[in-house]
Amino acid sequence: MTENGPDVVLVHATNNSPEDLKLLAETKTPVSLSPYTELRTGFGITPVGSFLRAGVPVSLSVDTTILCGNADMFAIMKAMSNIENGLQKSEFGISSQRVLEMATIDGACALGLADHIGSLTPGKRADLILVRTTDVNMLPFTIATNMIVQAAEPSNIEAVIVDGRFLKRDGKLTTIDMAQLARDTADTIERARKEASKEGAGKGINQLFTR
């Protein structure tokens, strides 16, 4: 822990003593919280408020789609917001603005890329998404930050622009052949099943997954 610092990112970090939090704050070590993974795997409840009150830099991440189901940062933001509100026993335990910052500029800071990405600022890369505010789940559209954190989902994204290049436009991906991707993933799964069947022949489930 004493070797941590701004060039190290701790992922999860759900179980920390007050001494741990103090050290993380003093060394300016950023923490990346992945609430869906932490809940699903039983790592524990993500104590974002404890980190923030201690002055620890906090960002949000998906971790891995194998554990969280999909790469849905809207769901991650909503989970983080609702978990903290539940812990604080208050609808206003953490603001949507603060959660959105953790999902954007704070993540860029954690990676040392805040001079290039993370906010819509002249001179930074043109990385942005366009969200439809007229879809039924976004109505009535009121406070933008609240709607993005509490109501938005991937299907509302009209466009994705990365470094000025459209990767999604008019609601459709521009650089990926989804039909081919579906075929490739199906082939990969089938090969994995065949290999697993060969390896597992004559073995019990415990033997197969114990090295």
Segments (PLM) and residue ranges:
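Active-site core of metal-dependent hydrolases
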Residues: 1-70
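His/Asp/Glu-enriched, well-ordered alpha-helical/loop segment
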Residues: 2-4, 49-136, 150-153
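Short, flexible active-site loop motifs that bind/organize anionic cofactors or intermediates
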Residues: 11, 89, 171
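Flexible loop residues that form catalytic
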Residues: 13-14, 85, 134, 165
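Structural motif corresponding to alpha-helix initiation and N-cap regions
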Residues: 17-18, 42-45, 93, 117, ...
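Short Asp/Glu-rich motifs
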Residues: 43, 70-71, 142, 179
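Active-site microenvironment of metallo-dependent hydrolases
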Residues: 104-211
